[in-house]
Design a protein with these regions (language model features):
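Asp-based, Mg2+/Mn2+-dependent phosphohydrolase catalytic module
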Residues: 1-9, 22, 88, 112, ...
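N-terminal helical cap/lid subdomain that shapes the substrate entry/recognition surface
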Residues: 3-108
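A short, Lys/Arg-enriched amphipathic alpha-helix followed by its capping loop at the start of a domain
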Residues: 31, 114-121
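Secondary-structure boundary/capping signal
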Residues: 39, 85, 105, 122, ...
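Glycine-centered short loops/turns at secondary-structure junctions
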Residues: 121-122, 199
Length: 229
């Protein structure tokens, strides 16, 4: 692919560098050890992960609030499991989840090698739809903070990917152009189309098997991504 003229590389965080599924699973494992549920963690996660993904899509589209997202993903999972969970229990689990999640530091295999290879050739930044404090804790606790000049969260900017404004404001703050920038992320809708629509280049890290497309290069590992640079 053509990388000539690129000065700035923007990464998504969750599902791209930070291994969300692994860290989320460990978070729920900790919660399950504290609370007594009549089903296994594996069964819970089988329902929770796709529900969480669907709720995040609704959140990106401004169809639900942050509070709705946090409540619905648990409530709908318990409904699938035919488990009667009170509002108080759901809120308790949600608070524990938010508190514990960012303490787990696991990155996708090859993350540090990739960032080390790029840090002296490009300016590196993050654009994430995650919540400000939580994302900052994730970055700090996983040991990658020093690689990035700017971290843009939807909460801070006021717009979620794929809204044009989060890309426009990020490019302006970094003092670069769309033509000199590339976006790397796992979400075709939020990361790839959002960036391409603003004139940026993009690489799709297809970490959870979205549909194949021809809009930009697709990679399935960070080692494969590193080879493109």
């Amino acid at each position: 692919m053509k990388l000539k003229g690129i000065t700035d590389v923007f990464f998504d965080l969750d599902h791209t560098l930070w291994d969300f599924e692994k860290n989320s699973g460990l978070t729920f494992n900790k919660i399950f050890l504290e609370l007594n549920f009549p089903f296994s963690l594996d069964v819970f996660l089988k329902f929770y992960n796709p529900i969480n993904h669907a709720q995040w899509k609704l959140y990106r589209e401004n169809k639900i609030t942050q509070e709705d997202l946090r409540f619905n993903r648990l409530n709908k999972t318990f409904e699938k499991l035919n488990y009667s969970a009170s509002i108080g229990l759901i809120n308790n689990i949600s608070e524990k989840y938010i508190t514990y999640l960012s303490t787990f530091p696991h990155l996708f295999e090859g993350t540090l090698e990739l960032l080390e290879a790029l840090k002296n050739r490009f300016r590196l930044h993050i654009i994430t739809n995650g919540f400000d404090k939580i994302q900052q804790f994730k970055i700090e606790n996983s040991g990658i903070e020093s690689f990035f000049e700017f971290v843009f969260t939807a909460e801070k900017v006021g717009f979620k990917k794929p809204h044009p404004e989060i890309f426009i404001q990020s490019l302006k703050t970094v003092n670069t152009t769309a033509e000199a920038s590339i976006m790397i992320g796992d979400s075709f809708e939020a990361d790839i189309l959002g960036a391409l629509n603003q004139g940026m280049q993009a690489i799709h890290f297809n970490s959870h098997n979205e549909e194949v497309h021809t809009k930009c290069p697709i990679v399935y590992s960070l080692a494969e991504l590193k080879a493109l640079f």
